UniProtKB/Swiss-Prot annotation:
It holds the Pfam family TRAP_alpha. Residues 187-220 are cytoplasmic. The gene is IRC22. The chain crosses the membrane at residues 167-186. It is a single-pass type I membrane protein. This is Increased recombination centers protein 22. Residues 1-19 form the signal peptide. Its main location: endoplasmic reticulum. Residues 20-166 are lumenal. Belongs to the IRC22 family. Keywords: Endoplasmic reticulum, Membrane, Signal, Transmembrane, Transmembrane helix. GO terms for cellular component: endoplasmic reticulum membrane. Is probably involved in a pathway contributing to genomic integrity.
Length: 220
C-alpha cells in the first residue's frame, strides 16, 4: 500500500473494501464505496495520544487500541474482527499486516455506538511507520473492511546488552582512561610527598675553621 492510498484513509469519509469476492460485478470491482460509520480510536499506552505525533515503542511491544464505533446506517451491523496494515513512513510501502483478531460479532443498532479494546503486537525493525487499523463489519450479510485514520509510530533501537561487543569496547576504553588518570594522579602525588620530605630534613653540620679564634673562645 503506497502513501497516497494511506492519505485516502485519513479523510473523514470511511472507505469500504469487501472482504470477500462474492457477488462483485465488473463495474463495482474498482468503485470505492462509502458508508455511514464513524470510527475513532486512541492508544491506551499513550495517555496524551495525538494521531499526528509519533508514538515511541520497542520492537515486539504490545499496544492496546481503544475503539469507538458509531453506526449511522439505516440497518444494524455486526463487528466481526480487527485487522489492518502497517506502512513504512519513508517508502510508503506496506511492511506488515495487523493480525486479524476476532471480536465475536458485536451487534451495533442503528444510531448507536459501542466501545471495545484490541491488543496489537508490534514486531517491526527500528524506524518510522504508520499504523492503519481496519474494523471488519458485517452489514446485511456482506463482510467489509472499514478503514480508520492512521497513527504515526516510531520503533526505537533495541537497548544495548551488557555483553554486546560495542558496549564491551566502550567499557574497555573507559577502564583504560580511568586507569591512566589514576596512575598519573598517583605518580604526581608520590612526587609531591618526596619533595616535602626532602625539604624538611635536618641541616648538615658544618665544620668550622677554629684557627682564627682566640684561645679563650676555644672549647676546652
Amino acid at each position: 500500500m503506497k502513501l497516497s492510498n494511506l492519505l485516502l484513509f485519513a479523510n473523514v469519509g470511511t472507505l469500504l473494501v469487501k472482504a470477500t469476492d462474492e457477488n462483485i460485478s465488473p463495474n463495482e470491482e474498482n468503485t470505492p464505496r462509502y458508508a455511514q460509520f464513524n470510527i475513532d480510536y486512541s492508544v491506551l499506552d499513550q495517555p496524551n495520544y495525538d494521531p499526528m505525533a509519533p508514538m515511541e515503542f520497542e520492537n515486539g511491544e504490545n499496544i492496546t487500541l481503544a475503539f469507538n464505533f458509531a453506526n449511522n446506517e439505516e440497518v444494524p451491523v455486526k463487528l466481526i474482527a480487527v485487522g489492518g496494515n502497517i506502512i513504512n513512513a519513508r517508502s510508503g510501502d506496506e511492511v506488515a499486516n495487523i493480525t486479524r483478531s476476532s471480536l465475536g460479532e458485536i451487534e451495533v443498532d442503528v444510531n448507536t455506538s459501542v466501545s471495545f479494546n484490541q491488543a496489537i503486537n508490534l514486531k517491526l525493525d527500528e524506524g518510522d511507520y504508520f499504523l492503519l487499523p481496519n474494523v471488519f463489519v458485517l452489514k446485511e450479510g456482506e463482510l467489509m473492511a472499514v478503514g480508520t485514520s492512521p497513527s504515526r509510530i516510531k520503533i526505537l533501537p533495541p537497548p544495548m546488552s551488557f555483553f554486546n561487543p560495542k558496549f564491551l569496547s566502550i567499557q574497555a576504553v573507559l577502564i583504560g582512561v580511568i586507569s591512566y588518570f589514576t596512575y598519573f594522579i598517583f605518580r604526581s602525588s608520590k612526587k609531591e610527598r618526596r619533595g616535602v620530605v626532602s625539604k624538611t630534613k635536618a641541616p648538615k653540620k658544618v665544620k668550622l675553621d677554629e684557627s682564627w679564634l682566640p684561645e679563650n673562645h676555644l672549647k676546652k
